[in-house]
């Protein structure tokens, strides 16, 4: 049984329990493979989980990703992955959240799932009086036309993996090496650049609370990490 590291994160309603795992700073590939294994091994009564991580610098190309949108990767590795969407960048100072949820148990569809994630991000930014919005046909969250959070998801047998990336206090220069999400010239921004906090912990706490509210979850933090080994 996993050791509980802290009290459950509060939610506005009693809800379904979900394990919360803070992975710290990790390379992308081991976490990607771990969430694939978790999703493949899920059974009807497997508890949902939410993983939180900061990744080492990496560009990822989703299933719709076109190599020509990677303009000048330089020393930053490029990985083709199995999420939806185009190309994006992950790096230190960006909060990445992977909700591993059973949509059938939550009784929501994929469209509602995406909308709930976007609303959690919008409500998180409102904590610091940052007015954000969603765009029809372009998943993610935007402030004044600049993208501050990207979504890239995969659903297998009704269960989600991959998730969201939220620019908190990071070097945005690598985004100039790609066409973010497949859009040439798309501007990006961060919480810090918009007058919000620089600390990841402050933003993380608010976002997790908002996600718990949107999905009706009671988050149960655990110190146990998933198996992050890579296949031989």
UniProtKB/Swiss-Prot annotation:
GO terms for cellular component: cytoplasm. The active site is at residue 181. One of its GO terms (molecular function) is lipoyl(octanoyl) transferase activity. Pathway: Protein modification; protein lipoylation via endogenous pathway; protein N(6)-(lipoyl)lysine from octanoyl-[acyl-carrier-protein]: step 1/2. Its main location: cytoplasm. Keywords: Acyltransferase, Cytoplasm, Transferase. PANTHER family: LIPOYLTRANSFERASE 2, MITOCHONDRIAL-RELATED, OCTANOYLTRANSFERASE. Belongs to the LipB family. HAMAP family: LipB. This is Octanoyltransferase. The gene is lipB.
